[in-house]
């Protein structure tokens, strides 16, 4: 325990300027950094130096000072990271086993099974760990890990990032050390990551590793409603994000047979869920509890539902910590398009309407319009209320009920009634089954090899993740029985991606280019094929998932065929179909493109499949406020001899855009268009192209700087007609007024811009 007895002493020790300079010079030499000015960095450190700073305070100050220069060049971020990681290594023990013992002694949080495995096989496990890989993290990534992911005792960080990765590998494969090594090496090398709850809870007591839970109330009664609230509370306690639907809960004013009273409707119920979410804290400063509530647009209280997150209005009708989402049927979209009437019903009278979809829904809905009481509104009036809510609050999400059911390998189980917290999971849930999804994402930039995307390496990793997520299903702790029952019966998984925009930049592909569109399709076809192949191989050994019979895949129908599309011919789909006919598949669902908000920060990738929001921006997280530079852009401009203090100021002055900086070659400007400059039609086209190979859905954000009714209507209908399941996760908008850019020397920027050569000579880097 020597490291821990010395930890406080190390923190309180003082570091001198000479030692700081020596260390920085060593980092620059070791990392072969060509763009770090040691004298300038040390000068900045000296300018704010305080003689009585402790070692911990000095480390924080020096790393923050280096990080403040990231906009000068991303290499300063490597210095920041090196300072922090070196310090973590100083104050933590070298032995993984000793750290686990220490955690168990002081917090008692390691599971007895995993504790026994670690103690028995400690030498084997420690021989696999490479702590040098901790230095692969960016400054931003390492701070995020320190703040929220690495295990602490009190305020003391006990483990290193590699220890966390080893916990994950051990949790998944236990004593199968060949697979433990394989998974650890890929995690350590930043090829993929498991979901945040898996990183948090692996090897701990009650290892709840799943991200997403979808709840349907058992019944419209006090007992049914509070059973749902109880489930939500317990799942939130164990780091799960929740999507639930209230389609079947009666509306305000409807009669209560048991008491003779009147229902207060869904708004007070949503406020109870809102308060529950606020009350329950998931692991202190870790993942906060979150709930998304789905409602069909025929529900009598739909207009009040749309008001829930608005900034103004009576507080008794607001629940701003809840995320709202719509579960939209085709008939509503048709009526909006044709400017027809729309009927609102109380679910206690419109019995079974949420239980059907497609033509069956249309027939029942039209029957109810003729036979039961209803409120009639113009469909476009409701549509306008939806758009107004989205412009003000960014929500509700737009999920298309009929597409989600029509294009689902779980359609044989019953009607799917909602998505999840992030609108990428589409699974069947009922009063008896709370659906679950276990997630992981692949870091796409890691598969660039000699200027090409390495599909074989990519396919190998997809197959490894498919196996991993099956083990997660098997070894997961299920906080409620309904979740265990559903996950064991249907065995859905969700493999996603991060860094698609980074991949395009590395390969010199503009987001809107034909090349990007083609690669996008090829990646997700390969991903679906590889996951399906691995799932079939597992089924050969372990049998198909228990609810396999009757599913589309049991009939030899792939997801892209449900969508009426054909595969490219790159892969042997017919051979795979024949193998599935013989053995089945182990999983009902395979691909789900989640937001990756937390893990992409750790691994230094752009989120999921999104375009870059900016080329220079401030990131705010639990760990603080950070300036992020698009390092691919900086590297390109450095090669062209264009990156300078003045250029940095120009990019800041242009709010992270380079489109008006004509000294930058046109090809480069095309590659680094931001989300605000890319046509949303192109973003939706990419989403639609990959959707045919995504058997769940995708957390698709829409970026419109100053959205209007007509713009949003156009985007929604375009995505709907393209066959998207999730038409919109969040609507991202920009502030009406820009913040004052205190760091910009505006006159110098203008002078530099006017003096630059504005000819668009071809870029040699883009011609290959």
UniProtKB/Swiss-Prot annotation:
Q: Which UniProt keywords apply?
A: Allosteric enzyme, ATP-binding, Deoxyribonucleotide synthesis, Disulfide bond, Nucleotide-binding, Oxidoreductase
One Pfam family it belongs to: Ribonuc_red_lgN
Q: Site described as Important for electron transfer, positions?
A: 729-730
- GO MF term list: ATP binding; ribonucleoside-diphosphate reductase activity, thioredoxin disulfide as acceptor
- Give the PANTHER family listed for this entry: RIBONUCLEOSIDE-DIPHOSPHATE REDUCTASE LARGE CHAIN, RIBONUCLEOSIDE-DIPHOSPHATE REDUCTASE LARGE SUBUNIT
Provide the function of this protein.
Answer: Provides the precursors necessary for DNA synthesis. Catalyzes the biosynthesis of deoxyribonucleotides from the corresponding ribonucleotides.
Q: What is this protein called?
A: Ribonucleoside-diphosphate reductase large chain
Q: Please name the source species.
A: Encephalitozoon cuniculi (strain GB-M1) (Microsporidian parasite)
